[in-house]
Design a protein with these regions (language model features):
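Catalytic cores of Mg2+-dependent Asp-rich isoprenoid enzymes
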Residues: 1-177, 183-284
């Protein structure tokens, strides 16, 4: 009973992270079936904690760069250790480890994620090769972690791997989400953090990034129907929320306020997804 209570407490702690940090993903996860909802929130929580180490919270607390790196390294060690042992005194790590052990999330996904987070402490400007490596570790593997949850949560048997088509779709959706966030945060990344992920300050480059985003979103949309039924509405909502952001980014010059989707539009997108609609495709 104590172990079960601890697991439940860890899951609840992880769920509080997404409620505090993300209206878009928080809205989408509410459309997930109960089989997977808590698991995905636990994945998000670990990702968010690591991101906060490198994106400002640790620095705001007075940690110098070397201490931020040490803290990130310690979180990675704690995570990998908990995945092996099944326990962590860190509630967010414990919740993630329980999900990883059940759903077949292994070090081959976790280590690239932390490698990309570490890059944020070491690299200020990316070329196309380092951009692609960063996006794989910071976003595509997160999509693959969620995919492992979708196909394995609640299974009585050993975890299985998703189909190659679903793997490709998860990667392209994760890449699109990350590139959209890069464009939304271009000024803040440059001014506050001194980072350039895209080199997209020229209009032609910005257009090329948006074209790539649309291609990734369209490719990912084609795979949603192959997901388990209790995951499709949530993925459709997340896809369409970011597709709406991409549309609004294309209409902006990137110099004004951070582009966002108004709450009534978010609600309409979520309602459409909940009704069973397919993801929108720009180039259908």
């Amino acid at each position: 009973m104590t172990s079960s209570l601890y697991d439940q407490t860890a899951t609840a702690a992880a769920a509080s992270v997404i409620r505090a940090y993300s209206t878009s993903f928080g809205l989408a996860t509410r459309l997930l079936g109960p089989r997977v909802r808590g698991h995905v929130r636990s994945v998000y929580a670990l990702v968010r904690v690591a991101d906060e180490i490198v994106d400002g919270a640790a620095a705001a607390a007075g940690l110098p760069l070397a201490a931020q790196r040490d803290t990130l390294d310690a979180l990675e060690r704690e995570t990998l250790g908990a995945m092996a042992s099944g326990f962590s005194a860190n509630l967010v790590v414990h919740a993630f480890a329980q999900v990883a052990r059940e759903c077949g999330i292994h070090a081959d996904l976790v280590e690239p994620f932390f490698a990309s987070m570490r890059t944020d402490l070491e690299t200020t400007a990316h070329d196309s090769a380092s951009h692609d490596a960063y996006v794989y570790g910071s976003a595509e593997v997160v999509g693959l972690m969620c995919l492992q949850v979708f196909v394995n949560a609640g299974r009585p048997d050993a975890p299985v791997q998703a189909s190659p088509a679903l793997v490709a779709g998860a990667r392209r959706l994760g890449a699109a989400f990350q590139d959209i966030n890069f464009l939304r945060d271009l000024a803040d990344d440059a001014e506050r953090l001194g980072r350039d992920y895209l080199g997209a300050d020229r209009p032609s480059s910005r257009t090329a990034v948006l074209d790539r985003i649309d291609a990734d979103l369209d490719a990912a949309a084609l795979t949603v129907a192959d997901l388990p039924a209790d995951c499709r509405s949530a993925v459709t909502a997340a896809h369409d929320l970011f597709a709406e952001l991409a549309r609004r980014l294309r209409s902006s010059d990137g110099t004004g306020a951070r582009v966002r989707v108004p709450d009534p539009v978010k609600a309409a997108i979520a309602a459409r997804a909940a009704a069973g609609a397919r993801p929108r495709r720009r180039n259908a």
